[in-house]
C-alpha cells in the first residue's frame, strides 16, 4: 500500500461512513480530528478489528480526539435522495458537527461531498489514514449499537447478527414478516417484500 502523504496543514479531519449496503436503518458517518500529542495505537479499518477492540478504541477516540462528531441520514432521506446523495448529506452533517473547524478534510472512498473547506478523497483511506480509521470505528460502533437496539424491538429479523445487510436469513424474514418502518423502501429486496416490484 502506498503511504499516504498528508496535506501541509494542522487540523485535519477524517470522515467515513457505515451502512450504505444494508436494507434497514440509517447510514451513519463520523468526522474525527485527532490530537497529535495524544496518539492512539492500533487504529485500523473498523471492519478488520474485533468488536471488543472496536469498542475499546471508540472510547479512546472520544476521550483523546480534539473533536469528533457523528452524522446520519435516515431511511426516509435515503429513499428520497438515493443512497449516494444521502451518504454525502450525512458526511456534511458529521463535518458540520465538529466543534473545531478543520482546515482540511480527508474522506474515505472516491466521492467527495461539498464542504466549506478543502477536502480530498482517499481510496482505502480507512486503512491508510488514522483520522479516517478513527471515523470508521466511531461510525461502525454507533450503527452496530442501533442495530442491536432495533433487534430488541424486532427480534424476528435478526438485526443484531446481520446489521441489516441482505443476508439469506434477512431476506427470508423480510418475505415472511414484511418490512418495518425502518426498512429502506427504495431498495430492491424491500420493494419486492412490499409487493412494489417483481
UniProtKB/Swiss-Prot annotation:
<dbReference type="InterPro" id="IPR001352">
    <property type="entry name" value="RNase_HII/HIII"/>
</dbReference>
<dbReference type="InterPro" id="IPR022898">
    <property type="entry name" value="RNase_HII"/>
</dbReference>
<dbReference type="GO" id="GO:0004523">
    <property type="term" value="F:RNA-DNA hybrid ribonuclease activity"/>
</dbReference>
<dbReference type="InterPro" id="IPR012337">
    <property type="entry name" value="RNaseH-like_sf"/>
</dbReference>
<dbReference type="InterPro" id="IPR036397">
    <property type="entry name" value="RNaseH_sf"/>
</dbReference>
<feature type="binding site">
    <location>
        <position position="108"/>
    </location>
    <ligand>
        <name>a divalent metal cation</name>
    </ligand>
</feature>
<feature type="domain" description="RNase H type-2">
    <location>
        <begin position="10"/>
        <end position="198"/>
    </location>
</feature>
<keyword id="KW-0464">Manganese</keyword>
<dbReference type="GO" id="GO:0032299">
    <property type="term" value="C:ribonuclease H2 complex"/>
</dbReference>
<keyword id="KW-0255">Endonuclease</keyword>
<feature type="binding site">
    <location>
        <position position="17"/>
    </location>
    <ligand>
        <name>a divalent metal cation</name>
    </ligand>
</feature>
<keyword id="KW-0479">Metal-binding</keyword>
<comment type="function">
    <text>Endonuclease that specifically degrades the RNA of RNA-DNA hybrids.</text>
</comment>
<keyword id="KW-0540">Nuclease</keyword>
<keyword id="KW-0378">Hydrolase</keyword>
<dbReference type="GO" id="GO:0005737">
    <property type="term" value="C:cytoplasm"/>
</dbReference>
<feature type="binding site">
    <location>
        <position position="16"/>
    </location>
    <ligand>
        <name>a divalent metal cation</name>
    </ligand>
</feature>
<dbReference type="GO" id="GO:0043137">
    <property type="term" value="P:DNA replication, removal of RNA primer"/>
</dbReference>
<dbReference type="GO" id="GO:0003723">
    <property type="term" value="F:RNA binding"/>
</dbReference>
<dbReference type="InterPro" id="IPR024567">
    <property type="entry name" value="RNase_HII/HIII_dom"/>
</dbReference>
<keyword id="KW-0963">Cytoplasm</keyword>
<dbReference type="GO" id="GO:0030145">
    <property type="term" value="F:manganese ion binding"/>
</dbReference>
<dbReference type="Pfam" id="PF01351">
    <property type="entry name" value="RNase_HII"/>
</dbReference>
<comment type="similarity">
    <text>Belongs to the RNase HII family.</text>
</comment>
<protein>
    <recommendedName>
        <fullName>Ribonuclease HII</fullName>
        <ecNumber>3.1.26.4</ecNumber>
    </recommendedName>
</protein>
<dbReference type="GO" id="GO:0006298">
    <property type="term" value="P:mismatch repair"/>
</dbReference>
